[in-house]
Amino acid sequence: MGSNVEFHDFSVKVMGEIDDRVNIVLEECAGELESQIKRNSRVDTGKTKNSFRHHVDDDAHVAYIGSPDENAIWEEFGTGEYAINGDGRKGGWVYYDEKGERHFTIGKKPSRAMWNAYSRMKNMIIRRIQDFMKGL
């Protein structure tokens, strides 16, 4: 009365499929978030807006979104008397723009392009990842 039981280990295949799907949905969501950040950005020359990029680390399953442009920090958090934490320079200062023109300012109001994009899209991204992973 013996029965033959045969065991097949598909764990490597399953884990590979999970890895692939995670990276696909991360790429999709990071791209959407990058696009929303760009739509939220103030535009003068377009340099800062166009500097935002995303990168997915396939091994770590992490998406990075940001800008190497120093102005992106100032746009996000503000400067001078408008700095988001109130810790900016007070009293104003003079600067020269790219055309060499002189300006006086008390700071730059924060645009919060990244924060607003994240706040707007967070729940949608969570739902998208959940729905995408259900298909396994």
Question: Can you say where each PLM-predicted feature lies in the sequence?
Answer:
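Short, Lys/Arg-rich flexible segments
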Residues: M1-A72, N85-L136
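His/Glu-rich zincin catalytic helix
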Residues: W74-E76
